[in-house]
């Protein structure tokens, strides 16, 4: 990651490295690097396990006019900064989105980015969408919710003076990215350079932990954000539907991974699931009165005339204690 910045053709930058209380030699390595590179500053905080906390700490220290946030496993291509800063200087935009190059362990990769005509299934796509447009932040938010926009952001610093990163859950930065889109007046794309994402199964976001059962808060907050900005009911209903799917997936995840946790951890997770359920409130259209499909802790079901429920796919191995707890 650091080498990809040091090797940039643009050199007027500052590197702020924040170590999230690691127990290896990370901080020592960073401080040694800073001795030989005055543009690199190394800091450490007590371990949180929440990326947004680390990012907000770095934001407070950042002094530059533009802002790029990288994870330690990832990198940027050689002309990333040079082309981005020139575009900022020549055009009145607030965010530039770059394609993402996903690198896998078998040296295979795929490049995705831009605006797509149809909802994007990342596992099936390996091509760029439209990148020759400048769009409003409001449209970018809408495209992203419908899974038609993807890109890695390079910010004008003013965006993050207004909005920091959400710290409610370990994936709070996913909420903040969309909030930043809304804050921007104009958003552009560069498709000749890439953000390189190394798909690491052992990264903090891949490991199963209690924090996974907080991820529902991101979409709960996105629903409130969309309502606050007076988006159409169709979009808000889309978010609401995603929230029910997340609840369902988290219930399945608990059933499959329960054996990994202590009894105390199980109780914490169950309380998080209950909190999630208590914040769910379905948004219906007039057509949903006759019947609609939905999901909950028991499985997938159809609701008829808002009264009768038929489960057509139940969650296998549903723990009796779990079912009792989530329905009391």
What are these regions (language model features)?
Residues 1-7:
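Short, well-formed alpha-helical segments that are part of the catalytic scaffolds
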Residues 53, 82-159, 163-164:
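Flexible acidic/His/Gly-enriched loops in nucleotide-sugar-dependent glycosyltransferase catalytic domains
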Residues 19-28, 47-48:
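A conserved acidic beta->alpha catalytic loop
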Residues 254-328:
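Membrane-interface aromatic/basic loop that binds lipid-linked glycans or pyrophosphate carriers
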Residues 127-215:
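Conserved nucleotide-sugar donor-binding catalytic segment
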Residues 45-62:
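Glycine-rich, basic loop-to-helix element that forms the pyrophosphate-binding segment
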């Amino acid at each position: 990651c650091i080498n990809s910045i040091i090797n940039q053709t643009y050199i007027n930058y500052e590197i702020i490295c924040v170590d999230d209380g690691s127990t290896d030699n990370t901080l020592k390595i960073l401080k040694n690097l800073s001795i030989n590179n005055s543009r690199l500053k190394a800091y450490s905080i007590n371990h949180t396990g929440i990326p947004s906390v680390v990012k907000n700490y770095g934001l407070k220290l950042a002094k530059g006019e533009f802002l790029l946030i990288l994870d330690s496993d990832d990198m940027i291509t050689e002309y990333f900064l040079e082309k981005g800063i020139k575009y900022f200087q020549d055009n009145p935009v607030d965010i530039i989105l770059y394609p993402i190059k996903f690198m896998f362990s078998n040296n295979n990769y795929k490049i995705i980015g831009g605006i797509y005509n149809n909802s994007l299934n990342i596992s099936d796509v390996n091509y760029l969408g439209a990148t020759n447009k400048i769009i409003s932040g409001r449209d970018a938010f809408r495209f992203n919710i419908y899974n038609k926009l993807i890109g890695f952001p390079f910010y004008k610093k003013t965006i993050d003076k207004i909005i920091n990163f959400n710290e409610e859950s370990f994936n709070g930065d996913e909420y903040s990215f969309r909030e930043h889109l809304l804050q921007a007046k104009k958003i552009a794309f560069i498709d000749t350079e890439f953000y390189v994402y190394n798909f690491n199964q052992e990264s903090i976001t891949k490991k199963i932990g209690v924090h996974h059962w907080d991820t529902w808060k991101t979409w709960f907050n996105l629903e409130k954000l969309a309502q606050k900005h007076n988006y159409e009911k169709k979009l808000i209903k889309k978010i609401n539907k995603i929230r029910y799917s997340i609840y369902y997936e988290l219930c399945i995840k608990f059933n499959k991974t329960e054996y990994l946790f202590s009894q105390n951890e199980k109780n914490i997770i169950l309380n998080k699931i209950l909190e999630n359920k208590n914040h769910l409130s379905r948004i219906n259209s007039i057509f949903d009165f006759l019947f609609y499909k939905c999901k909950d802790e028991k499985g997938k079901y159809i609701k008829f005339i808002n009264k009768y429920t038929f489960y057509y796919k139940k969650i296998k191995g549903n723990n009796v204690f779990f079912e009792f707890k989530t329905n009391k």
